Amino acid sequence: MASFTVGIVVFPGSNCDRDVSWALEGCLDIKTKFLWHESSDLNDVDSIVLPGGFSYGDYLRCGAIARFSPLINSLHDFIKSGRRVLGICNGFQILTESGFLPGALVANKNLNFICDDVDLNVITSKGGWFQKLNENQNIKLPIAHGEGCYHCDQDTLKRLVDNDLIALKYKTNPNGSTSDIAGITNEKGNVLGLMPHPERACDESIGGIDGLYTLRSLITQ
């Protein structure tokens, strides 16, 4: 996939950017490019990943400061053009803080940091994010977060359900998320935010390859 480039955004405090690059280049032969958060030129990338970590130290709230960066401002036109954006963990938090996805990520119900492999159900394949997977199919991905509890009001939940925007649900809810939600898409289907880490499940030697379904979807046209 030498002609296709995935941009990986790097904020102060990002710590999963190189993991994402390794997964895409090493496991899928997809070219990547690191994008410093102060950049606003996205013309030479075809898809974008907002990786996990602790952008700006997660001060105020997770993603609350990152949403003011020049690059996030440029995402408006990028998303409108139909190109794909994947937000993983802290990236999901940034997408909700920036208004690209509805709801919010708040502290886990038990107030503890959770690091574990979790079973998930694919609820919708809208936008082609889970290629070759059927709805309600089970996958296993790692989670690692302290503020991964997805919260939304009942009107928002109804909109998510009615418009088929819930991408993933936890089989056993680890953090208190509303309706067991682990990931959602926008209405156009080209933006996906999820708390689990697909880049940590892309090689059998590190526990599984279920993350490849999501990462491979970055090159869907």
Swiss-Prot record:
Keywords: ATP-binding, Cytoplasm, Glutamine amidotransferase, Hydrolase, Ligase, Nucleotide-binding, Purine biosynthesis. Residues 5-221 form the Glutamine amidotransferase type-1 domain. Pfam families: GATase_5 (PF13507). The active site is at C89 (nucleophile), H197, E199. Signal peptide: none annotated. It catalyses: N(2)-formyl-N(1)-(5-phospho-beta-D-ribosyl)glycinamide + L-glutamine + ATP + H2O = 2-formamido-N(1)-(5-O-phospho-beta-D-ribosyl)acetamidine + L-glutamate + ADP + phosphate + H(+); L-glutamine + H2O = L-glutamate + NH4(+). Pathway: Purine metabolism; IMP biosynthesis via de novo pathway; 5-amino-1-(5-phospho-D-ribosyl)imidazole from N(2)-formyl-N(1)-(5-phospho-D-ribosyl)glycinamide: step 1/2. GO terms for biological process: 'de novo' IMP biosynthetic process. Its main location: cytoplasm. It is found in: Cytoplasm. Gene3D superfamilies: 3.40.50.880. Its EC number is 6.3.5.3, 3.5.1.2. One of its GO terms (molecular function) is phosphoribosylformylglycinamidine synthase activity. GO terms for cellular component: cytoplasm. NCBIfam families: FGAM_synth_I (TIGR01737), PRK03619.1 (NF002957). Part of the phosphoribosylformylglycinamidine synthase complex involved in the purines biosynthetic pathway. Catalyzes the ATP-dependent conversion of formylglycinamide ribonucleotide (FGAR) and glutamine to yield formylglycinamidine ribonucleotide (FGAM) and glutamate. The FGAM synthase complex is composed of three subunits. PurQ produces an ammonia molecule by converting glutamine to glutamate. PurL transfers the ammonia molecule to FGAR to form FGAM in an ATP-dependent manner. Part of the FGAM synthase complex composed of 1 PurL, 1 PurQ and 2 PurS subunits. This is Phosphoribosylformylglycinamidine synthase subunit PurQ. The gene is purQ.
